[in-house]
A protein has these predicted regions:
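Conserved AMP-binding/adenylate-forming core of the ANL superfamily
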Residues: 10, 18-50, 55-64, 68-72, ...
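Conserved pre-ATP/AMP-binding loop-to-beta segment of ANL
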Residues: 17, 151-180, 187, 211-217
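Conserved AMP-binding A3 loop
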Residues: 31-33, 176-202
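Conserved structural elements of the adenylate-forming
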Residues: 36-41, 191-213, 221
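AMP-binding/adenylate-forming catalytic core of the ANL superfamily
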Residues: 105, 399, 405, 427-519
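Conserved AMP-binding/adenylation subdomain of ANL enzymes
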Residues: 199-217, 227-311, 320
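Gly/Ser/Thr-rich phosphate-binding loop
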Residues: 266-269, 279-367, 470
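Conserved ATP-binding/catalytic segment of the ANL
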Residues: 375, 382, 389-390, 394-448
Length: 547
């Protein structure tokens, strides 16, 4: 690997020094040069705090320009950033900080108010993302240094310029970051990603999304604490000399449309739910009007109508749209049929945290219905059938994008890798031309409204601890989480409670359950079952039978 991630970043900062780089919603944009200045200030701070290459630095806050600069400061210093989803409950944040051996924690006000620093005894410095001021430091000298940081910087760099910007020269197999797929004890896995994986993802995006040019804007909607948002909505555009516009939180349709109009993005990265909502609210009501519905059945006329709808839809996205890349979940079949009929520029990719994240992709004009593209550059894939003679099987991959393993979890690492191949846990099939189709996800992952990973087993673990619950199964129904519950009728009978009363009692505990869950993973409805779930010989629930 002659090229590296930090080299790509350094070249982009150098070429685009006076161009826009980072912008928070409603704020003045920062140039690449201004961002570089803040990054170098943070390098000085890390040095004063005694941070060495490969030391861990946790980040937990809403998406923002400062979050981005904190991450870039860590990775270009040679430290290992540990991004944490700010929607996680306090206990999960404590678990990740402790398990990752983080020495520094950068956070925002909301996270600071939610957590307890006493639960993270190994932390040496805690800093605000809002203004990069210290909240806590084991050593007084760090707080003093922070108060004089601007003065120290000005003295060290009286005429700060690109020649003063020095980035860590990484090795391909060196740890770049640790990304936790969850925060709960017992479920937590820290995915250890090397620099080669980040570089390979960014390089693929640069080579295959050629219409994005320096000075183009990208809107960040997905969580930066997840690899999809981090690699494709932040690192990739910054390596291209683009600017990133941070919405900061799940936006209202009004804010989103305003951002599209202002930024006029050529590329939008999203989860399918966002596009599906726009189609259902903006397009379907129009097409379902009696007259248009009639005209849609007339050959030729329907094409004219769909062409007009396509133009209106692209205008709603800012007017310059070249492509929307969807990932993280399957696109609704009916919506996909409509998008294909109107030749709308969408595509569906496939990836996972363990591949930082890309595994498969194809541009919109090549993608096939229900497919998620072809295996990306520098990666190989094979299907391992669960049963002899079947085309569908588990997808195994290897190549530049794959992780090193799970942090401090050799057992999980060993169970995922075999002879250099990594098991994705997803059931897939290839067609004769190499397009990949996902038939089912062994990992049962559910995608939240803004791209958050929802692990149903974790929610079920909490539900099963509620009074009179025998077993449960969490399913996704059109974006709403529903818990299928089998009450413990025997226990209820022993306590003199009849069947209907125990169902009501369990239902009354839904609010208490949701208080234990992040907002995006809360249960909309309990649905009671009179019979237990069908099981495998190992007594695992046959999840695919229940929707």
């Amino acid at each position: 690997m002659s090229e590296s991630l930090n080299q790509l970043l350094h070249e982009s900062f150098s070429k685009n020094w006076n161009h826009k780089a980072l912008c928070d919603l409603g704020k003045t944009p920062l140039t690449y040069g201004e961002a570089a200045q803040q990054i170098v200030k943070l390098h000085l701070l890390l040095q004063e705090a005694g941070i060495k290459p490969q030391d861990k630095i946790a980040l937990c806050g809403k998406n923002s320009a400062n979050w981005s600069m904190a991450f870039l400061a860590a990775i270009t210093y040679g430290a290992v950033p540990v991004p944490i989803l700010n929607d996680f409950k306090a206990e999960s944040i404590h678990n990740i900080v402790n398990h990752s051996d983080a020495r520094i924690l950068w956070l925002d006000d909301a996270v600071l108010n939610a957590i307890s620093l006493n639960e993270m005894p190994t932390l040496e410095v805690v800093m605000q993302l809002g203004d990069f001021t210290p909240v806590y430091s084991k050593e007084e000298k760090v707080i003093k240094f922070c108060s004089e940081l601007d003065k120290t910087f000005a003295e060290k760099y009286p005429n700060f310029g690109i020649n003063d910007l020095v980035f860590h020269k990484e090795q391909p197999e060196e740890i770049a970051l640790i990304n936790y797929t969850s925060g709960s004890t017992g479920f937590s896995k820290g995915v250890v990603l090397p620099y080669r994986a980040l570089w390979s993802n960014v390089r693929f995006a640069i080579d295959n999304i050629t219409y994005l040019k320096a000075d183009d804007g990208m809107i960040n909607m997905l969580p930066l604490a997840h690899m999809y948002g981090l690699a494709i909505e932040m690192l990739f555009p910054l390596c291209k000399g683009c600017y990133v516009y941070f919405l900061g939180k799940t936006p209202s349709p009004k804010i989103l449309m305003g951002a599209f109009a202002q930024v006029q993005p050529k590329l939008i990265i999203a989860v399918p739910l966002i596009l599906e909502k726009i189609i259902r609210s903006k397009v379907l009501p129009t097409l379902q009007k009696p007259l248009l519905n009639f005209l849609m059945h007339i050959p030729g006329v329907s094409n004219l109508i769909l062409s007009k709808v396509r133009k209106q839809l692209i205008a709603a996205f800012g007017g310059q749209l070249e492509m929307i890349v969807l990932g993280g979940a399957a696109l609704n079949g009916d919506i996909e049929d409509l998008l294909r009929r109107m030749k709308f520029p969408y595509t569906v990719g496939y990836g996972m945290t363990e591949c930082a994240p890309l595994i498969a992709y194809a541009p919109w004009y090549e993608i096939r219905k229900a497919s998620c593209g072809k295996i990306v550059d520098r990666m190989e894939a094979r299907i391992v059938p669960l049963h002899d003679g079947e085309d569908v099987g588990e997808l195994w991959v290897k190549g530049s994008n794959t992780m090193l393993g799970y942090y401090k979890n050799q057992e999980a690492t060993d169970s995922t890798f075999k002879d250099g191949w990594m098991n994705t846990g997803d059931l897939c099939i290839f067609d004769k031309d190499g397009f990949l189709y996902i038939k089912g996800r062994n990992k049962n992952l559910i995608l939240g409204p803004s791209g958050q990973n929802i692990y149903p087993e974790e929610i079920e673990d909490k539900i099963n601890n509620l009074p009179y619950v025998a077993e449960s199964l969490v399913v996704d129904r059109e974006g709403m989480l529903v818990a299928l519950i089998v009450p413990d009728f025997d226990k209820a009978k022993q306590d003199g409670i009849d069947a209907e009363a125990v169902k009501e009692l369990i239902n009354n505990n839904r609010a208490a359950l949701n208080k234990m869950l992040a907002s995006y993973s809360q249960i909309t409805r309990f649905e009671m079952r009179d019979e237990e779930f069908e099981k495998t010989p190992k007594r695992s629930i046959r999840r695919f039978l229940y929707k």
